[in-house]
């Protein structure tokens, strides 16, 4: 009947479309693209080469070895500063991968350092026993590898520009914590200097 034929046709179309959709999703999730921006400002900051990345979701996308290779590629860009704006790890990142990735970050050579602010996945949604480490353990490992962790903090770099690292919104919305407003974070800053905001 026509009804059965149209159901079969819908099934024949739905299955390949689903496969294509999942394949494209996997490809986009597992590959990294470089996007370059040049910003011009009247502020007296001079030239600054910033490399920023987010949403690596180590363990879901690639593991520690893959992340370390990407850090080698970032090093070739000769950044003045590296900014990691959240979801570096998530609930499926093993402790071994987390440590290996923090060590890879610690090997980066930059003029002004590496800075990290939290995303909604970094501290984990489950009990720390699920992945073998807590948000505090992640902070300790990052800091051990000379990564500066910013949680509603502002840093003046070389008297040239500011970096503001915001607490993730999930801290306030899902975990009952506090997140400072931009007004609070910028009220004492010199407006003649360039400001970079890290906000997942």
Describe each model-derived feature in a short phrase.
Residues 45-200:
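Soluble catalytic domains of enzymes that build or remodel membrane lipids, polysaccharides, and related
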């Amino acid at each position: 009947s026509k009804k059965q034929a149209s159901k079969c046709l819908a099934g024949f179309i739905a299955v390949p479309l689903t496969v294509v959709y999942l394949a494209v999703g996997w490809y986009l999730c597992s590959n990294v693209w470089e996007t370059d921006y040049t910003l011009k400002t009247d502020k007296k900051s001079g030239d600054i080469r910033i490399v920023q990345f987010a949403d690596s979701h180590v363990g879901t996308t690639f593991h520690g070895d893959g992340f370390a290779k990407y850090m080698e590629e970032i090093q070739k860009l000769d950044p003045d500063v590296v900014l990691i704006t959240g979801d570096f790890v998530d609930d499926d990142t093993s402790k071994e991968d987390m440590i290996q990735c923090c060590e890879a970050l610690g090997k980066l050579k930059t003029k002004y350092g590496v800075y990290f602010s939290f995303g909604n996945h970094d501290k984990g949604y489950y009990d720390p026993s699920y992945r073998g480490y807590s948000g505090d353990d992640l902070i300790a490992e990052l800091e051990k590898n000379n990564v500066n962790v910013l949680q509603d903090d502002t840093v003046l770099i070389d008297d040239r520009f500011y970096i503001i690292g915001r607490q993730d919104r999930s801290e306030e919305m899902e975990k009952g914590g506090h997140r400072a407003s931009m007004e609070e974070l910028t009220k004492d800053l010199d407006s003649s200097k360039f400001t970079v905001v890290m906000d997942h």
